[in-house]
């Protein structure tokens, strides 16, 4: 069994900076593969609401734009950020565009898929699949694209410190 945790990984921000996930150790992290031209794109609004509600208590939310499903994220990193900010008021961090399946799968998604394999396998089926990583960096819960951000608020709440 691997001793690797989510917090041993890193990603590249949409501004080109390397972001070590170790800086978020001990905090819950919600990871979402996103797209700007998808039927689920309006979930950006709900994700931003989760970010605004829970960030001050420790939730980290990261969007990972992906163009692997129906070519629904064709823009550049700058265009994606502008679209998210202007249309949905997104303030949570975004990565550079990544792959979530196949030989080019980003290490974050390789880890998450392995930790939260479903009865249907580990492949991500569509945009806006969500992964909630517990503060231990090992426990991961996976949510289908059809699960709205509001529907996972209680699971997030359960991982946050209570005043």
Language model feature labels by segment:
Residues 1-163:
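Chalcogenol-based redox active-site neighborhoods
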